[in-house]
Amino acid sequence: MENSTTTISREELEELQEAFNKIDIDNSGYVSDYELQDLFKEASLPLPGYKVREIVEKILVVADNNKDGKISFEEFVSLMQELKSKDISKTFRKIINKREGITAIGGTSSISSEGTQHSYSEEEKVAFVNWINKALENDADCSHLLPMNPNDGSLFKSLADGILLCKMINLSEPDTIDERAINKKKLTPFTVSENLNLALNSASAIGCTVVNIGAQDLKEGKPHLVLGLLWQIIKVGLFADIEISRNEALIALLKDGEDLEELMKLSPEELLLRWVNYHLTNAGWRTINNFSQDIKDSKAYFHLLNQIAPKGDRDDGPAVAIDLSGFNEKNDLKRAGFMLQEADKLGCRQFVTPADVVSGNPKLNLAFVANLFNTYPCLHKPDNNDIDLNLLEGESKEERTFRNWMNSLGVNPYINHLYSDLADALVIFQLYEMIRVPVNWSQVNKPPYPALGGNMKKIENCNYAVELGKNEAKFSLVGIAGQDLNEGNATLTLALVWQLMRRYTLKVLSDLGEGEKVTDDIIIKWVNQTLKSANKSTSISSFKDKSISTSLPVLDLIDAIAPNAVRQEMIKREHLTDEDKLNNAKYAISVARKIGARIYALPDDLVEVKPKMVMTVFACLMGKGLNRLK
């Protein structure tokens, strides 16, 4: 290690030793690559997942002196010096603590050596198993897999054929996967891989980060990866309606003097917290600030249940009486048990055990509260004529596609609202790095922003983002200023975001073609040549070609790239109604994902022949075709 790196004082050394001991959950005297990566995730660094992995990979080369995949304390100190010298470790504070209910298993990845430890949460596994058992209990396609036993490893085996994952994705975001594309009978290793590809690429399309998960990981049932993916899928479903344009009653959560625009910027987690506090205030109880420390005694939950339970005076069914006698129980665990008995009366006992409440498990308590909200929101839209309801227009399909694309790449923070969450351009910079546009991070203002002048800091970021787009990325950004991004000007923001997505899509292609620049014409030419050489009668003249509305050129191209992937009896070829076209498109998108194409476009994009999204579909398929040739 070079001498120019930061020196570490004795005090810091002692702190590092203490930190190392906390990370080293199995007291083996070293931490593994996986534990390091988790540590980064826990630290509040404004870095996307892919960046964290890059840092870990690069630093392991430097710090892991004896190349055994394990980091000793001495190596850890030199690693910290490296990080400090790169000014990355300012917020390197949160350390993974050893917790009860953590199951450690031997490392199985090719990077990790024998003896490395991957840990997963037993509580999460139990919660997810119970949730899936209930959600899919009546699905005949899953009868050979359900119910799973929450007390053993059957979850990891049951997910291995991909069927359950596909079903859970459709529960969270209906119609994401065309059921006709799922292989259900007489499964072979190949058809199982297809199912897992379909699940992964569909999860990606609904905004789950899957950059470090492969079909093989799911087939092998690697617990930490399986649980991580499952949580993301479940969360998409739980949060789907915690959004003001989908649920106008949330306007009741407006505070005095607050603009609707401000409320609309809140994340689902923040809205849930505000919803709980709305009911706690009505109950005359103190408010909470989190779903961990503040709910451990179950008392807030008792009041919440009492507030939202049907009183029999509205359309939400017969009255349910909440018994508050358990509120005064002295023992926390018993009190939590009594509280959950009351939640059970509302059919909402899912996700937490009494121990999960008392330990303050933030993930599972968040899920518990989201499920309560979805079942009994107990909110009434105020008769307030001052509110501009035009603001409540939901996001367009195009906006949602862009948002899901960004989130699937692991950007940080997660994008809940396309415009307000891009207002400081941090995510734009991360996307620039992914398309190899260098970002000078020392020029970027990072959160938390000051109360006074904070927006100016965000505008400075946006100015830099536009400057990079024009000068480095060579994007066409005529008439776009930093302020437009900051204010969330839809047309101008979308113009930049589309060019980012286009460049990202084409970068994947040019990487396959040894760096050759790829243009629309090259893609169209390749599509037509591939169709012709497979003796297909379809072709396209441009990405606006009306024949694309039938999806037949897409389906024929898939068949040319991956023979037998398309079942011809599923396709309607003549006298197509609008419904036929949509059915073809749904099938085409799902089969494309099944053969491994990471497609973000929606069936409607094909039916309506949206040239931008059509381009991404053909580009992804070209990537798949070139990959197969290699």
From Swiss-Prot:
Cellular compartments annotated: Cytoplasm; Cell projection, Stereocilium
The UniProt record lists the keyword Cytoplasm: yes
Database matches in PROSITE patterns: ACTININ_1, ACTININ_2, CH, EF_HAND_1, EF_HAND_2
Free-text description of this protein's post-translational modifications in UniProt: Phosphorylated.
Residues of the Calponin-homology (CH) domain: 122-238, 266-377, 396-505, 517-626
UniProt region (Actin-binding 2), positions on chain: 382-626
Name the record gives this protein: Plastin-1
Organism the protein comes from: Mus musculus
The entry's keywords: Acetylation, Actin-binding, Calcium, Cell projection, Cytoplasm, Metal-binding, Phosphoprotein, Repeat
